[in-house]
């Protein structure tokens, strides 16, 4: 397991080291019973294989924001229940039939990292809720954050923090 994580970290390092631009960035691990936990932590978990996704009580991820819109419009766009798809235990809303069709062609390209939990929280081994209007796209991957300060902190050492968050995610759910 340790060797696998080392290889994963090195692969992530190489992938991010050959990076391009970062879009969307301005020029205690929680488990078991969550009753009474910090209000920033989601209280609803949905199994998706061996992983968890951050959804509301109806199973909707990212509070209904359109994951394709982050990539095509470079902004958070509210989706509609009229256009929806379920993928790996979460329901995704889209702002248009075109975005829904795009998602269905390659869902893994658009899903948020760390199941939609705050990337900075995951860096610290915490499952913190996210605000879907606070996001970045790094190397073609969507990251969401609890608030703008978390996003800023995560991007102070982006490569290092992605590697650490990836490691923590695999420790929790793999």
Describe the function of each predicted region.
Residues 18-88, 108-174:
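Intrinsically disordered, low-complexity terminal tails and linkers in eukaryotic proteins, enriched
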């Amino acid at each position: 397991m340790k060797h696998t994580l080392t290889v994963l970290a090195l692969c992530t390092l190489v992938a991010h080291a050959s990076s391009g631009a970062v879009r969307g960035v301005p020029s205690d691990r929680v488990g078991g019973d969550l009753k009474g936990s910090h209000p920033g932590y989601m209280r609803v978990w949905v199994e998706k294989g061996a992983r968890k996704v951050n959804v509301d009580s109806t199973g909707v991820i990212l509070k209904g924001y359109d994951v394709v819109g982050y990539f095509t419009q470079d902004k958070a766009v509210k989706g509609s229940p009229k256009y929806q798809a379920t993928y790996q235990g979460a329901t995704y809303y889209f702002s248009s039939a075109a975005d829904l069709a795009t998602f269905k062609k390659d869902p893994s390209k658009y899903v948020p990292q760390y199941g939609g939990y705050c990337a900075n929280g995951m860096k610290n081994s915490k499952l913190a809720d996210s605000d879907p209007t606070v996001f970045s796209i790094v190397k073609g991957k969507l990251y969401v954050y609890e608030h703008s300060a978390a996003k800023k902190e995560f991007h102070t050492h982006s490569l290092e923090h992605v590697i650490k968050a990836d490691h923590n995610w695999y420790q929790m759910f793999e």
